[in-house]
Amino acid sequence: CLKPNMIIDGTLTSEKSSSKTIAEKTISCFKEVVPEDVPGIVFLSGGQTEIEATENLDQMNKIGNLPWNLSFSYGRALQASALQAWSGKVENEEIASATFDHRAKMNSLATLGKWESELEK
């Protein structure tokens, strides 16, 4: 498996690419350089928000008919909301766990190309 970043806009650009454009550019690049016998590609979130990382992964999987499985290996984009909800307090563990579960579920749906923004709380 490979563990790359997605092709996203640079920090100095004034325009923001759509998730569809990011997906198309990323997949186009990989089709040129990644052998079809590579079993999977797991993406890093690389400076994206939680929602951006999920939406971009979803858009790539919606392209369909790809030779690789596309999934995620997110750190911050999987944990940030849960850590914020927890804030190191025992009394926040339940909400933090639910927050983490939600984010994991959203990313799981994105690996299937079945995530929709309406599913976000």
Placement of each model-derived feature along the sequence:
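Active-site capping/gating regions of soluble enzymes
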Residues: C1-K121
